[in-house]
Amino acid sequence: QTAQDDVFLYYPRDTAQTQLEARADADPSVLDRMEASYAAYAASRYTAVPDGYDELQTLCDEAKKDQKLTEAADIGDYIRAYLNTNYQYNASAPQPPEGADPIRYFLTESKQGYSVQFASAAVVMFRMFGLPARYVVGYAAPQSLFTQQEDGSWHAILQDDNAHAWAEVYISGQGWTPMEMTPGVLVSAQQADLRTDPLPETQGQDTAPAAGE
């Protein structure tokens, strides 16, 4: 594999939040209108649930009512615990039969998978809770891959086994927020240690997050 010239800029979430707050202070009406418009778009575009998941919908409805789950973080914790408890990580998980629904196959038959299956199932469940959610594919980059350049920047060459999938939930005022659902991988942006989750070869070493879509 040859190195590519692609450069991905990294903007820490706290930096983005500071910039948004500064813009809101300067002209809150503009930001509010933009936020309201996109929130409406996200709600119309990213909340559809496929047919045939009645039992899972009932599970989510009961959890929302019984545990009073309304915040995205709490809902994420519930979904993560449910998936990590009832399903097994397997980088060599069997593929669904031709023509089968891959998410339903994961949830009801194989009950094992890697980041693709965990993220896909999580997106469906987030939507069942009423939250706009989407499926994202990118990379999880080990810290060891990064080398500092003379200009102070950090570069890394990412390969196929750094590929990773995760769910993102739209939260008003924050935008699309990553929700990691794969067992053994980063849960929140504040956590320093996580493992890569190749698609679908083998899990790797401690890593730092690198996002793509």
What name fits each language-model region?
Residues T18-L20, D77, G113, A165, ...:
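Active-site-proximal helix/loop capping residues that flank conserved catalytic or ligand/cofactor
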Residues G99, L107-Y114, F118, Q159:
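Secondary-structure capping and boundary motifs in well-ordered enzyme cores
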Residues I79, T207-E213:
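Gram-positive cell-envelope targeting signals
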